[in-house]
From Swiss-Prot:
SMART domains xrefs: RNAse_Pc
Cystine residue pairs: C51-C109, C65-C120, C83-C135, C90-C97
Binding site for substrate: K32, R35, K66, P67, V68, N69, T70, K91
GO BP term, pick one: defense response to Gram-positive bacterium
Superkingdom classification of source: Eukaryota
Protein name, UniProt field: Ribonuclease pancreatic
Active site: H37 (proton acceptor), H144 (proton donor)
TM segment ranges: none
Family of the protein in this entry: Belongs to the pancreatic ribonuclease family.
Region Disordered, residue ranges: 25-62
Main location: secreted
Length: 149
């Protein structure tokens, strides 16, 4: 009886770990947003090579060249506060997007036409624009960069 119970418990443990394990290493949407879009150091400083320097640490080019990416050079708290500002419709039609009430310092990285993975080459364009972000969760935080306007 003892061996039979042990086998049942072991089987249940393996089953539970099989369900839980895939989510253990998965990056959350808020963490992915921070990794892909936040550069609070504001390290671009008008460098024409900023986007090419950022492609590896921010994983802009993991398996393929990302066509466009925008970095936000503002404190995370300021970006999170946008989640309580004006609601707008997202590009995909969802209703969880919010538009910043003021402009933010951003850098747009656009893939140059002749670039192919793994040698992704980007143009760097700094500007001050309003941004639109999707927010979700509890607490309600940024999970997707939708646009700059």
């Amino acid at each position: 009886m003892g061996l039979e119970n042990s086998l049942i418990l072991f089987s249940l443990l393996v089953l539970v770990l099989g369900w839980v394990q895939p989510s253990l290493g998965k990056e959350s949407s808020p963490d992915k947003f921070k990794r892909q879009h936040m550069d609070t150091e504001g390290s671009s400083k008008s460098s024409p090579t900023y986007c090419n320097q950022m492609r590896s640490p921010q994983e802009m080019t993991k398996g393929s060249c990302k066509p466009v990416n925008t970095f936000l050079h503002e404190p995370l708290e300021d970006v999170q506060a946008i989640c309580s500002q004006d609601k707008v419709t997202c590009k995909d039609g969802k209703s969880n997007c919010h538009k910043s009430s003021s402009t933010l310092h951003i850098t747009d990285c656009c893939l140059k036409g002749s670039s192919n993975y793994p040698k992704c080459n980007y143009t760097t364009t700094e500007s001050q624009k309003h941004i639109i972000i999707a927010c979700d969760g509890n607490p309600y935080v940024p999970v997707h960069f939708d646009a700059s306007v």
